[in-house]
Every structure is written in structure tokens, then in C-alpha cells.
């Protein structure tokens, strides 16, 4: 039995897709990386804005708002890039080939 989050996948399905467990682990890692990016990005932005606030006073709710937006944007970027890597991994595990739009030539 392969676990995907809280649900279990049938053995027959797992046998047809041997890379399912690796893909699930990759997706989980990507989402946790996104959560970590949101927390650290929001905290770092808030700290920076509190430092700037000493020179240019403004209401603190703007610091919260800008920090949350910056953390969300950074988290979205990181999560989408990591999920794309997981999709490429899934295609490779299923077909044995890399997607056509990815070049493996280091000189490109």
C-alpha cells in the first residue's frame, strides 16, 4: 500500500505506477518548502519593514500587509517551481524520458 497524504492507494494502481511514492514524496517536499518560504519570507520582510519604520514612520498594519503579500508571492514562486520539478520527475518515472522542453545540454 502506498500512502498519498491521508489516503491509501490500491496495490494494483501502485503496481501500474512504480514512481508514485517518489512523486508523492516530491510533492510533499515542495509544499513544505513553500510553507517554510512563506513563514521565513513574511518574517524577514516584517523585520526589514520594522527597521525601515524607524526612519519613515507609518502605520504598522502596512507592515503586516506588505509582509504577508511578499511572503505569499515568494511562497507561490518557490512552490510552483518545485511542483514543476515534481511533474518532470513523474514524467521521467512513467516514460523514462525527460520532457521535451528541458535541455540536458550544459552549454545552452
UniProtKB/Swiss-Prot annotation:
Cysteines engaged in disulfide bonds, as pairs: none
UniProt entry tagged with the keyword tRNA processing: no
Any Pfam family hit: TMEM141
Record InterPro entries: Tmem141 (IPR026788), Tmem141_sf (IPR038259)
Domain of life: Eukaryota
Keywords from the UniProt entry: Membrane, Transmembrane, Transmembrane helix
Membrane topology, record value: Multi-pass membrane protein
Keyword set includes Magnesium: no
Subcellular location: Membrane
Main location: membrane
Record-annotated membrane-spanning stretches: 30-52, 59-78
GO cellular component: a single term: membrane
Similarity remark: Belongs to the TMEM141 family.
The protein's name in its UniProt record: Transmembrane protein 141
Source organism per UniProt: Mus musculus
Gene: Tmem141
Amino acid at each position: 500500500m502506498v500512502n498519498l497524504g491521508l489516503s491509501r492507494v490500491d496495490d494494483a494502481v501502485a503496481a501500474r505506477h512504480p514512481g508514485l511514492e517518489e512523486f508523492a514524496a516530491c510533492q510533499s517536499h515542495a509544499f513544505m518548502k513553500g510553507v517554510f518560504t512563506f513563514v521565513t519570507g513574511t518574517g524577514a520582510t516584517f523585520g526589514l519593514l520594522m527597521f525601515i519604520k524607524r526612519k519613515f514612520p507609518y502605520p504598522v498594519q502596512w507592515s503586516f500587509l506588505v509582509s504577508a503579500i511578499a511572503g505569499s508571492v515568494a511562497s507561490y514562486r518557490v512552490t510552483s517551481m518545485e511542483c514543476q520539478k515534481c511533474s518532470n520527475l513523474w514524467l521521467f518515472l512513467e516514460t523514462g524520458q525527460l520532457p521535451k522542453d528541458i535541455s540536458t545540454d550544459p552549454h545552452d
